[in-house]
Amino acid sequence: MKKFVTTVLMAAAFVAANAQDKLYADEFPLGDVTLNDGVLKKARDLNIHTLLQYDCDRLLAPYRKEAGLEPKAKAYPNWDGLDGHVGGHYLTAMAINAATGSEECRQRMEYMISELQTCADANVRNHPEWGRGYVGGMPGSDRIWSTFKKGDFRVYFGSWAPFYNLHKMFAGLRDAYVYCGNEQAKQLFIGFCDWAIDLTSGLSDQQMEQMLGNEHGGMNEVLADAYAITHEKKYLDCAKRFSHRRLLTPMSQRIDCLDNMHANTQVPKVVGFERIAELSGDEAYHNASTFFWDIVTGERSLAFGGDSRREHFPSREACTDFINDIDGPESCNTNNMLKLTEDLHRYAPDARYADFYELATFNHILSTQHPEHGGYVYFTPARPRHYRNYSAPNEAMWCCVGTGMENHGKYGQFVYTHRGNALYVNLFVASELNWRDRGIRLRQETAFPYAETSKMTITEGKGQFALLVRYPGWVKAGELTVKVNGQPVDIYTGPGSYVAIDRKWKKGDTVEVGFPMHNSIKYLPNVPQYVALMHGPILLGMKTGTEDLAHLIADDSRFGQYASGKKLPVNEAPILINDNIEAIADQLSPVAGKPLHFTLSTRTVNEIKGELQPFFEIHDSRYMMYWLALSEHSYEAYLAQLAKAEEERQALEARTIDKVQPGEQQPETDHKMETDRSFTGNTNDVFWRDARDGNYFSYLMQTGGQTDLSLRLKYWGVGEWKSHEFDILVDDVLVTSVNNTGKYRISEFKYETYEIPADLLKGKSQVRVKFVAKPGKQIGEIYGVRLIKN
């Protein structure tokens, strides 16, 4: 960036007040909550340092290009098919940090808004058919939107999630107004919303539903916010049109339809559902969002608050993927789940929302920032002894870099909320609150999570109000203590609630809260053999080594977000043995002088010497998060299972006449592969080959002169949303037609055997085995091919 615009031009467009508490009735402006020394303030400050290393002109380059203007700097190359998306996130991050006092972030925010105004003006001139109000950097904007407006979605569906991309700038402009009161950003935002209304006005409801089949971020949310700002019903109507019925209808009817859905496509939709419910009173939207939150946090989230694997919600049968896969929960999901949690708490305050917010903030969001260079994390694997990798400034412009830019500036947003005459203390965070409407200032002193107490002091003002202190769900019944000015308060509620103290407050009044933390275990959803160890709400992990941390700092490659070092064998990871699994938590012993560090004394197979510590402290290392935990009897059965598997493997080898590993160069060369537009990949460290729509691949295989043979194929058990239909031929003679569509619903390898007629083998030392996809169908990945004796 060449310079910042801080002239009278921008000063005239900026008003000192913000709109945060006007748009979100229970929130305090971010600038009225000051973080004091602690892990969250440290992360916030480091994030500002990281953010200021990015180049605004490079982030703005896609917007100038699509507006027909010469970019002032070269655009970032990574994820270029989604060009422009990080620019919107960055604008939000600048607004958030400007609101909490960063003058340089404010200058950058104002510069970006000035440049975006230039782009918006150019779009009117250069794209008169569709460009009025447009402020997007989506590659190929002219081809996408000129055809989209006519109801032709071919270019739209052939592009990488156009509305998802645009939503980031909708949100960025809104946030510059919400957090900083920037009127120019407000006008750009409302104009952009008018553009969306005009663009879709000619589409039928059926066309809208079809279009929403492409990932579109939280378009319904930002349009609902435009309604909240302007009170013009057209924005609320459009927000409802942007609400995907495929998700809204089953969720509102309490039907869980999430299996195999792309997780971060769904969460922003639901944030919009709840915003519409709040502003319109439509119970169907609220029912959808509460049910979604309940099943995601209650049944589909891991111990640190994250959800999804391979970016999708697994079925119950496929939850072992969390142990096997390296692409665990995605950081973006949790960013959006926290937004939803804030909205639900505003609609109906409930301590369970604050419990989840705390869990996800300290265990996931905080952990996704590298504590030294400030890089961001995409995936957090739960696979035993794997690791995470990090972005670097000005490289790796992933979606989770964008949300990461925002995350660490918002730590003060939910510490306190208010509703009528009530002040909610949702989180134990060292901070100061300026409740301007009441003339009250409150200071909270705590070292949480490294301490089990918090002290709140009224430092200015007086008045009658109810102070509601959270009784965390992780504190045992009867153990929370609250004192006002040194005198104990009678507590009539239990864990997972708020303790209300309604009185006349004055300067100098104190509230002391004690919240004893205990050790516990959390079971992996639907895989109860695996447990995580917790201390209070804090997930404990263990460092296990630093070997082969490939791509620890990600490069600019398309798939650089994967921690692609060696996957260490799961069966060689530590196993906890105890006849009382719950009692494992009682065998954690604190390490003297090291807060939240523990040793574990339970019997351990494949033991690794080390200490358990907060997961958010673990970086640049392989780690244990979930542990296989077995009783003595179950462990014996586990060993017997391994022995049986080895016996079966040896028996299979004895029956095998020939075998091919699809997707691997040498075996396919050895078997003289022939193919027409097939393709390969790797899942769970096993290569595969596949073909679709009449295309094929084949191998020349040895028969050993045998005529009593079958073909044994290896499949992966999840893939029921695809149409898997194909023919198997031997020497161009059909042996069988296979339909595997919806056949398996479990994340493990499956094997099928197909007998070959003897007359196709008689007198032959080799045969060509061919796999041909049915027209319009897909074979489905084949992971292994064997000729075996019957």
Question: PLM ranges: what are they?
Answer:
Residues 20-103, 107, 142-179, 216-234, ...:
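Aromatic (Trp/Tyr) and acidic
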Residues 488-508, 514-528, 680-706, 714-790:
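Beta-strand-rich ligand-recognition modules
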Residues 1-21:
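Bacterial Sec-dependent N-terminal signal peptides
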Residues 462-466, 703-712:
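Extended extracellular/luminal ectodomain segments enriched in beta-structured repeat modules
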Residues 90, 104-154, 300-308:
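Helix-terminus loop motifs that line ligand-binding clefts
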Residues 289, 355-363, 368-460, 494, ...:
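C-terminal beta-rich recognition modules with glycine/proline-rich loops and embedded aromatic residues
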Residues 193, 200, 206, 210-217, ...:
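Solenoidal tandem-repeat scaffolds enriched in leucines and small polar residues
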Residues 140-160, 186-210:
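Asp-box/WD-like beta-propeller blade repeats and closely related beta-sheet repeat scaffolds
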